[in-house]
Amino acid sequence: MAVKIKLTRLGKIRNPQYRIAVADARTRRDGRSIEIIGRYHPKEDPSLIEINSERAQYWLSVGAQPTEPVLKLLKITGDWQKFKGLPGAEGRLKVAPPKPSKLELFNAALAEAEGGPTTEAAKPKKKAATSGAKKAAKAAEPEAAASEAAEPEAAAAPAEGGEQAESSAES
């Protein structure tokens, strides 16, 4: 049985992503594969190339033939040189710089805006703020209503006859 190491396509229309697969030479491009040994994402910068070197060496040693695109990928990772015994087995694979974490970016933005990092959220939660305000307003309503009712009675009594009205609040 002739075995090939080839690319099987995944992804969207203009965003191809490939798996590096070992399959029978007679199967179609995205057909059944014997083993998946890596992946390749050409649209990323730099391109993502991950190949399980141990499995690639095994399949090359038992006679699997890489297709032209896979051969180029194997040369980039250094697996082809390692298999053939050529110099340059370390490969010339470019690695993307590590991305800063979101927490570091957040703390840096806070430091620029205010002057120092804090662990608290920028704004309090809406539910907590509204429920606390409602409770405070409900507690203040009966007190405010009682004081408002007492003031008009006291103001109206001296205006009528000049007599001092006895307030019911004193007893």
Curated annotation (Swiss-Prot):
GO biological process: translation
Keywords: Ribonucleoprotein, Ribosomal protein
Keyword Endoplasmic reticulum appears in the UniProt entry: no
UniProt GO cellular component terms: cytoplasm; small ribosomal subunit
Spans annotated as Disordered: 114-171
Extent of Low complexity compositional bias: 142-171
MF term (GO), any: structural constituent of ribosome
Domain of life: Bacteria
InterPro entries assigned to the protein according to its UniProt record, in alphabetical order: Ribosomal_bS16 (IPR000307), Ribosomal_bS16_CS (IPR020592), Ribosomal_bS16_dom_sf (IPR023803)
Pfam families: Ribosomal_S16 (PF00886)
Database matches in Gene3D superfamilies: 3.30.1320.10
Family per record: Belongs to the bacterial ribosomal protein bS16 family.
Name of the protein this chain belongs to: Small ribosomal subunit protein bS16
Organism: Mycolicibacterium paratuberculosis (strain ATCC BAA-968 / K-10)
